[in-house]
């Protein structure tokens, strides 16, 4: 498993986790279901239906508003596929030299402690689901509140799994910090408006967009504090 750490405003750290090649090959039933949902969502995105386009637009806004901490925990959740021996062989954290290891560890500890928060959110999602039943009785309008609560319940459940796995990873005490000058150079180019090197270095199509959203979220927090 590989974790990329990049600096954010307010002394925070953006953590991006994605599995090793070995972990990626272990396809589960859950993975197959999620892939089908993605394909279904893509078909709605391509549809010319006004209702479907509105639902997709609303859904995308919700996705973009998801806290970056939650995205990290949801990404780390599949680590449960690994046993302890495999975990020892696959985990490391790559970061630019100007980002201190202590700051990264503090962010990891902060993320690990979000389990209770997401548990409370999950309970709220489940309690709210019965309230959306009346929408089912309206045949021309999809039960968007129900779909939303189901989606948020799933997200919070995955975040809980992620926090549990993160605690497990940190208890093993085999987190290896690796400074990367290439990452530092790519980050400098990114701040100057060129995101291509950073995208190419990470090799994940959504990485730069997620990092931009994380920066924007912390900047909004700064404005609120001021």
Curated annotation (Swiss-Prot):
Any one Gene Ontology BP term: proton transmembrane transport
Top-level taxon: Eukaryota
A GO CC term attached to the entry: mitochondrial inner membrane
Entry's transmembrane regions: 121-141
Pfam families xref list: Mit_KHE1
Membrane topology category: Single-pass membrane protein
Swiss-Prot/TrEMBL keywords: Membrane, Transmembrane, Transmembrane helix
Places the protein is found: Membrane
Keyword Secreted: no
Signal peptide residue numbers: none
UniProt record similarity statement: To yeast YDL183c.
Protein name in UniProt: Uncharacterized protein C23H3.12c
